[in-house]
C-alpha cells in the first residue's frame, strides 16, 4: 500500500483552497481520518482511495456540480481528494441553510462517515438536543468527528495557521 507524502497531500488541499475556497485543514483532516493517506485503500463497502469515495457519492458530486468524474478518477490522488472535498462541501452548504457554520461542518462530517439518511434520522429524533448527543449518536460516529477535529488541529500546527 502506497502512502501519499504529507507535503503532496497538503498541496492538493491547498489547491482546493485556491480554486474553491475549501478549508485545506478540514480536507487534510478527512484524508488522514479516512485513509491515513493510503492511496489505493478500499473499504469493505466499496469506498475507494484517500477520501474513501463511494459510487453513490461520486454520482452525487457529478449531479450537484455538473461534472463528469469517473470511477477511474478515484484512483488519481488529486482527483480523489477533489471529489471527496466537493462531496463534503455539498453537505456543509446544505446544512448552513439552517445551522451555523460550526454545526454545519459537524453535521457534514457525520454525513460523510455515516450517510445522510442516518444523520437525518438522528436529527429527527433529538439530535439537536445536546443532552441526547451521547444517547442517540453511536460512539464510533462521535469518535470519527473527534478524529477529524484532532487531525484539523494537528494540520494547523504542522502546516501553519495562515489559511482560512
Predicted region positions:
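Non-catalytic cell-wall polysaccharide-engagement segments
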Residues: 3-7, 11-20, 56-164
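Conserved alpha-helical segments that form or flank metal/cofactor-binding pockets of metalloenzymes
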Residues: 24, 34-47
Amino acid at each position: 500500500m502506497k502512502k501519499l507524502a504529507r507535503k503532496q497531500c497538503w498541496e492538493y488541499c491547498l489547491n482546493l483552497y485556491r480554486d474553491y475556497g475549501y478549508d485545506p485543514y478540514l480536507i487534510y483532516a478527512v484524508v488522514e481520518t479516512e485513509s491515513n493517506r493510503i492511496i489505493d485503500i478500499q473499504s469493505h463497502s466499496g469506498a475507494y482511495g484517500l477520501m474513501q469515495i463511494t459510487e453513490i457519492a461520486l454520482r452525487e458530486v457529478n449531479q450537484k456540480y455538473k461534472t463528469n468524474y469517473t470511477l477511474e478518477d478515484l484512483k488519481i490522488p488529486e482527483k480523489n481528494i477533489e471529489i471527496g472535498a466537493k462531496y463534503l462541501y455539498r453537505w456543509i452548504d446544505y446544512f448552513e441553510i439552517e445551522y451555523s457554520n460550526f454545526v454545519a461542518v459537524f453535521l457534514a462530517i457525520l454525513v460523510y462517515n455515516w450517510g445522510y439518511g442516518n444523520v437525518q434520522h438522528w436529527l429527527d429524533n433529538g439530535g439537536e438536543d445536546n443532552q441526547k448527543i451521547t444517547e442517540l449518536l453511536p460512539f464510533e460516529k462521535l469518535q470519527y468527528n473527534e478524529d477529524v477535529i484532532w487531525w484539523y488541529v494537528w494540520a494547523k500546527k504542522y502546516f501553519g495557521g495562515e489559511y482560512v
